[in-house]
């Protein structure tokens, strides 16, 4: 997702199949990924349906900005987390790795043709799987833009050097993005600060150092 923060834009980019006869279908062995999953995978969408009759799939991105999906030439399709779990760490069980031959945006989704898949029935077996791509395969962010995944986990301090907490998420309220910053109260209870991700409060964002400096008081 792209959001406007006065020049700073954080980019957001987290079932058993059966045939008509009731027999379980198995994915082609060539699609199964048996090695260790890359450690920089980021969940960016899910397979909503097969598209057409030639093995294309339709993916619903998790964010308005689908640039990561369109830029990456290899996707990992992993089983959805258990019911009630919104997202979960990538698990290698029955992981599918596909090379993308073609992809394009289509009515708020991304449609793609996996290499080696030319049959709609195989594409249908991928429905419901979460789509992960490597962070290394994201397109480079433009000046003043940041991917949300790079902001989460950053320490937040103010100009006085006082620790404000750690970024645990972001909210898009339509006008701008808001950092969700978790911290601990003196009595040990967890609390949260909501800091607008706009130039009025931002001083520096150093993602390699995992540090964000803001104009924000401890008592705000």
Curated annotation (Swiss-Prot):
It is found in: Cytoplasm. Keywords: Chaperone, Cytoplasm, Ribosome biogenesis, rRNA processing. One of its GO terms (molecular function) is ribosome binding. One of its GO terms (biological process) is rRNA processing. GO terms for cellular component: cytoplasm; ribosome. Residues 143-220 form the PRC barrel domain. An accessory protein needed during the final step in the assembly of 30S ribosomal subunit, possibly for assembly of the head region. Essential for efficient processing of 16S rRNA. May be needed both before and after RbfA during the maturation of 16S rRNA. It has affinity for free ribosomal 30S subunits but not for 70S ribosomes. Binds ribosomal protein uS19. NCBIfam families: 16S_RimM. The PRC barrel domain binds ribosomal protein uS19. This is Ribosome maturation factor RimM. It comes from Cupriavidus metallidurans (strain ATCC 43123 / DSM 2839 / NBRC 102507 / CH34).
